[in-house]
């Protein structure tokens, strides 16, 4: 469901903002430093309760403000009201959903599925496994209802086992309890991830073919421990080495997506431009699969697309966005860079940011 209204106050260099975006393509232009990326950042915080620019949201509060306050309304029957506030002197976020306080971040994410494509996202292939796990789990979360509970239980059990590993003397009974808990929920989490990947692989292959036909590229899911052994057996056998390290070395927290060309990692074979196209295909395929499996669309936040893709691939990428029929926010320094990227029948809402002020064109 698209965002139909946004109200931001106290966000970086942006003036108080009241935006009514279009349900489809929204092009936001402006000079570097004008506030375009801050606008995307505000939407990201609304859906994820965190910024993609800073680990501490208080750093996004305008210098002359005591808090950053973000409100959004997601279209629907009925519409859904989202709210996130972070005061400079507060230790935690205040999150609201339809006026209800104390809402979990998972409920925000469920109400507003977001896909971010920015320079950091384009480094997905060469970055840490944690980024690829987050990418994978975004997809599983939105199509598998059991995922969040399994993920939460795994994190809890893992925390307890790691704490026990760091004790001078291990309580064998407690260790056994938490290893059984960790193994049970990890096996479920692995099954959900595996099921999703079986569906995602085809969507990715089809999308990539139009962006960058590559022979021999394979996408594989690695679950984080020996596929021939149950996790409980692995945990029991690895206690001594885990204790030496002070943490659990195998399990779903070590899962990864591996892209290869032949026997080599794809990142070692592909040019920087090719890597960007592969990541573009990954992101587009997730939105496509979400629509196919649930009938819901995600909102794409795309920062400075003209700087990341050449003209030809930019046009193909934009045509994919049109086919997905989702809401898109794209920033660009120059309007002309994306003027011819769309089909004539596509409605494009135009906005301009100038010295922190949003103007409708």
From Swiss-Prot:
InterPro entries: DNA-binding_RecF (IPR001238), DNA-binding_RecF_CS (IPR018078), P-loop_NTPase (IPR027417), RecF/RecN/SMC_N (IPR003395), RecF_2 (IPR042174). The keyword Cell membrane does not apply. GO terms for cellular component: cytoplasm. One of its GO terms (biological process) is DNA replication. Disulfide bonds: none annotated. It comes from the Bacteria. Gene3D superfamilies: P-loop containing nucleotide triphosphate hydrolases, RecF/RecN/SMC, N-terminal domain. It is found in: Cytoplasm. Keywords: ATP-binding, Cytoplasm, DNA damage, DNA repair, DNA replication, DNA-binding, Nucleotide-binding, SOS response. ATP binds at residues 30-37. Its main location: cytoplasm. One of its GO terms (molecular function) is single-stranded DNA binding. The keyword Electron transport does not apply. Transmembrane segments: none annotated. Belongs to the RecF family. The RecF protein is involved in DNA metabolism; it is required for DNA replication and normal SOS inducibility. RecF binds preferentially to single-stranded, linear DNA. It also seems to bind ATP. NCBIfam families: recf (TIGR00611). PANTHER family: DNA REPLICATION AND REPAIR PROTEIN RECF (PTHR32182:SF0). This is DNA replication and repair protein RecF. It comes from Chromohalobacter salexigens (strain ATCC BAA-138 / DSM 3043 / CIP 106854 / NCIMB 13768 / 1H11).
